[in-house]
Regions:
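Charged, terminal alpha-helix-loop-beta segments
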Residues: 1-8, 32-34, 68, 194
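N-terminal low-complexity, intrinsically disordered segments
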Residues: 1-28, 166, 170
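Conserved aromatic-histidine-acidic binding/catalytic patches
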Residues: 34-45, 166, 170, 174
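Secondary-structure boundary elements
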Residues: 42-44, 48-63
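Residue-level signal for secondary-structure boundary sites
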Residues: 43, 77, 162-164
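Glycine-rich, often proline-containing surface loops adjacent to acidic residues and nearby aromatics
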Residues: 24-39, 63-72, 148-161
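Aromatic/basic-lined ligand-recognition segments
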Residues: 11-18, 64-145
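Long, compositionally biased interface segments
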Residues: 148-194
């Protein structure tokens, strides 16, 4: 051992649940609660569902260390060229149609203790969930039809990290701040503003 502590096994139980439509669900384990949706319509509805879930679990939620909101948006070049959907600074050599393979852009912004990581991936392939997203528990939207095509995947993850005891008003305010920052960054990427 040489004085180095021996790692111990920690059992993690992961629970998943979806709504009746199959487009929204929760992933809950001993360290986190995540809400996933593949049919995002309204932040207020999503925030309300998340806060209701946390309120139900408030006896078990003692300490908050991270709050986050992540959105994935796929833009296909079918009805509109990608240049009509994505800002030009994210397109790379997209105009080189004959031999264009992919372009990858990543940015990290930090403001008011909110970290926002933005990834824009343009490629000619099948559209799929990133490997770190558990997309297998939810129904996939029509845009993920498994047909290879030229498309842009915009992946934006905005989060707060710290150590705070459970407080409903604090959670609501931080999630609103996170969403505002995420929306600002997304509007910097897309042509049609949200």
């Amino acid at each position: 051992n040489n004085g180095i502590p021996v790692p111990t096994e920690t059992k993690t139980k992961v629970l998943t649940a979806t709504d009746l439509s199959g487009y929204e669900g929760f992933i809950f384990n001993n360290r986190s609660l995540t809400i996933h949706t593949t049919s995002y319509v309204c932040f207020d509805k999503l925030l309300s569902a998340l806060l209701n879930a946390i309120e139900i679990l408030k006896e078990q939620v003692v300490l908050i260390e991270r709050l986050g909101f992540r959105t994935l948006n796929a833009f296909k070049e079918i009805d509109k060229k990608l240049s009509a959907q994505i800002q030009p600074q994210f397109l790379g050599m997209y105009g080189e149609q004959n031999n264009f393979q992919h372009n990858y852009n990543e940015s990290l912004c930090v403001s008011n203790n909110i970290n926002t990581l933005s990834r824009v991936i343009i490629q000619n392939s099948v559209i799929a969930f990133p490997p770190d997203v558990q997309g297998d528990i939810l129904k996939t939207p029509d845009v993920l039809d498994n047909l290879p095509c030229l498309h842009a995947m915009v992946d934006i993850d905005s989060s707060w990290s710290g150590r705070e005891k459970y407080d409903y008003a604090f959670l609501k305010q931080v999630f609103e701040n996170i969403h505002d920052d995420l929306k600002l960054k997304l509007n910097n990427v897309v042509v049609e503003k949200l």
